[in-house]
């Protein structure tokens, strides 16, 4: 079952006990999953996403920028996953995120040229840096809880 919010509708509550694909729209949405393994996509806007129980997947497939940063309120390691569209997250190969492409630290900065996804442990911010420690600016796309035991294995590129 898939549900997509119509334009100008702000909230989506997934009910029942079966897995549902819930997708937002271009404004700031609140999407709350159910007890099943849901796929939740905020689409555009600064969204608040809650998966609920179950092995949830949070999808990021829209243009990155300051008006498109989603807060995941209950990301559970290792049950949940973050899915990244490689048309948006340019330079990432499809499949599981490589360990070399992931960095976790308190600065939120890439340390070497391979770092692409950076989890800032003290704030929960998640960044994409298309050239690692090169000259391109990093872009925030999500906020999770602080100090999670998150690793590269929690990210899937499609």
Model-derived features: positions:
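Glycine- and aspartate-rich repeat motifs characteristic of hemolysin/RTX-like Ca2+-binding segments
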Residues: 1-71, 81-82, 125, 136, ...
